[in-house]
């Protein structure tokens, strides 16, 4: 039986740089292939070639789909063949309804007039295929990210898709939403729809894939049956070396208490009757990594936003630093107290995409380069930028390159570099490795370990429980705004953390002082 897709010896160059070099990929109808590789490995370039974003003639090699050679000059050409790609940044118009988004560019018309009755019937069938039950008149912007992802798939199904490409589809989804999405992909597989799945979450890759294809530095490293590969095997192929331990296990000593929060309560910014954080208290020691775990809506991000002075609603409670009560109502006051934060959404809150990498790094510490006068010392700033880029191993062709052009991992390193310029005593990391590759994760984990060895106290919030457990000395477990447990991390398991989150009573393990 012929393959549904064959990409043969694809090479794509940008100037003198080969982004992909003689890469081949093939898959059958109904097969799920995961495409793995670090950021910058060439995965996205290969998919852009496949989808016609890079048109025929701009690359070398051959693409055969359903027995015919594709020579696409535009993405619409491949869509007509039955190839659809869903990017991590969803391509939905949030002001339009769900129905309007699904049929956008593919409207059903009769004598030049849109036939809403036929579109509604088709809409109901499409949503049933992705297990959604939403009014066609619902505005897409009112949906959660998980539902928006499924609307994108329904939109692809409306184009008679035969090959669905999913690029980091679960980066912003909860575990429950991820589980629903994977079930739908498996169901589509039963109907003969093939899938190329791109993700840094190797547990998902293992769970969903028939085969796994690894690309490194633009070259095809290998394609193997998923059943015969461990996560360590995938990592070794991706990075070209064996990572003996993803989470550094170097000993570090905790010191005296540096932070204490007492009876913190935060209200919803609009509805004062809803408590997003409900009377929680905890402490943090110098050189300690404190993890905060919990399901979506637990109040984790709200808690640290209060600490950093950026929670948009009202809150009350007491914050003590070095035993002295402090008042923090904005980020400037937090920074003055030695607190720095890497935000949850780096694209929205962490970077200025069109600004240079270097300027993003020094953005919060410009006073370091003024020397008491209003004019910047450009030489001192440039020296600091180059040192920060080297220290954090930020991969950029130039400090003057717009930071929006860097990979997610390198953007995150630049944000960390900015935080370290503030000489923080307390560093808050909210989803520090979301959407970044395994190699960049490893480097960030090593950096965190180095910081606590210097006595910096670190708070880590992550939706990935293995990350929380792999990094933290102690774990706070939150659920629906309440602190449910304060657990010393002596080989804690994910099951113990989830049990603590969902049990009715509050549980605290006493710490040795």
UniProtKB/Swiss-Prot annotation:
UniProt GO molecular function: ABC-type D-xylose transporter activity; ATP binding; ATP hydrolysis activity
Membrane topology recorded in Swiss-Prot or TrEMBL: Peripheral membrane protein
A Pfam family of this chain: ABC_tran
Any Gene Ontology CC annotation: plasma membrane
Classification via InterPro entries: AAA+_ATPase, ABC_carbohydrate_import_ATPase, ABC_transporter-like_ATP-bd, ABC_transporter-like_CS, ABC_transptr_XylG, P-loop_NTPase
Subcellular localization: Cell inner membrane
Subcellular location, principal: membrane
PROSITE patterns per the UniProt record, alphabetical: ABC_TRANSPORTER_1 (PS00211), ABC_TRANSPORTER_2 (PS50893), XYLG (PS51280)
Enzyme class, first EC level, given as a word: translocase
Positions of the ABC transporter domain: 5-242, 259-505
Keyword Lipid metabolism: no
CDD domains registered for this protein in UniProt: ABC_Carb_Monos_I, ABC_Carb_Monos_II
Role noted for this protein: Part of the ABC transporter complex XylFGH involved in xylose import. Responsible for energy coupling to the transport system.
Family: Belongs to the ABC transporter superfamily. Xylose importer (TC 3.A.1.2.4) family.
Self-association and partners: The complex is composed of two ATP-binding proteins (XylG), two transmembrane proteins (XylH) and a solute-binding protein (XylF).
Name by which UniProt lists this protein: Xylose import ATP-binding protein XylG
The organism of origin for this protein: Shigella flexneri serotype 5b (strain 8401)
